[in-house]
Amino acid sequence: MKKKIAIIGSGVAGLTFANLIKKNSDFQFMIYEKKESLSLDDGFGIQLAPNSVSILNTIDFHKVNSKDIFHPKSMDFFSIKNEKICDLEISKFNSEYSKYTTLKRSTLIEFLKDEIYTQHLRFGKSIKEVTELKGKVLIKFTDNTNDLVDYVVGADGIFSNTRSFFEKKKSQPLFKKAIAVRLIFKKHNLDINEKNISLFMGSNLHLVIYPINQKNELNLVCIIRDKKYDPDNIKSLIERKLITQNSNLKDLFETDLQSWPLYSTSKVLPSSNNKVFYIGDAFNGFLPTMAQGAGQSIESAYELFNLIKDENLDASNIYFKKRFERTTAVRRRSNFNFFAFHFSSSFTQKIRNFFLKFLVKKKYFINSYLGSVYKN
């Protein structure tokens, strides 16, 4: 009898896992999403390093229209005043078919949903109760439906509701006293190469700009340290924290802005049930300062898929150990970047910039710091 999997959440992690299961196994599966629909509006950009692109290629990512993606070759580092510090060639981590890729998140979701939307995705589904029954997991939903499955895969984000039903130990995400602000634009007065990723570092903030398709659209994300999140006064925050450091940036933010508070996982905890797994941000939520959020969601889905596909009897322990080691390495780099990008004094900024110019030329350091993540 075919084994059955319930996937809770239809983000990048859940959809990637579902595609892997559909294409490469005979497991039955269903995705349960608490929202009423997938959000496919033109959204913000994401970055995919070769490590995640190689996985997506196993489910035909190469079929995505080339006009809807971009392959930046370099990352340019600037002061917040738009003074160039140095650059780093990121295309060195590419292989023939797996290249550093930027695109809209909605483009990725659109691709991932195509093969599973009709038969394998149910909306408006919130868990009400879970029980174990004859070696399986019985999930009861608030709409009075239920499902009896062999495995449950929690892919419902950093504030995972799935965890609250299965885990006694709690690990609340930590507010990092920082805000993310995003927008998409075309026209600007900045001195940048629009084909590259541009990173601007200022006092208690940084700003990243990169192309997301072949239509001259650029994604901008600004990370600003602030003690509280006030969504009604984001433009005031931008004016107070960013524009005072570079008034030339003002025009960029005179449009509709998306914003949210930044959280990260405080402590990574294993599943207490060998039939229940967590992937993506439900396993570990990162700061965006390593651009590995989507990448690690894809990686975690792939790691778990291979263990479940082979029906590994020790899948729970093997998965947690490998994923914990991997996320620890990425989290350390993300946290360090969050620290180094935001130096507030001109003295520490000059020291950082000096070492940055030196380190980007050191092949061993770059392979250790970035290559170990990008090429895994």
Identify what each model region corresponds to.
Residues 13, 37, 159:
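Conserved Rossmann-like nucleotide-cofactor binding loop
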Residues 4, 28-30, 217:
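Residues at the starts of beta-strands that form the adenosine-phosphate
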Residues 86-109, 188-259:
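Conserved FAD/dinucleotide-binding core of flavoprotein oxidoreductases
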Residues 37-55:
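Conserved N-terminal glycine-rich FAD pyrophosphate-binding loop of Rossmann-like flavoproteins
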Residues 353-376:
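C-terminal auxiliary extensions adjacent to catalytic cores
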Residues 22-42:
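Glycine-rich FAD pyrophosphate-binding loop
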Residues 3-5, 22, 49-166, 171-184, ...:
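Conserved N-terminal helical subregion
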Residues 6-22, 153-154, 209, 256-340:
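Conserved mid-domain beta->alpha element of the FAD-binding
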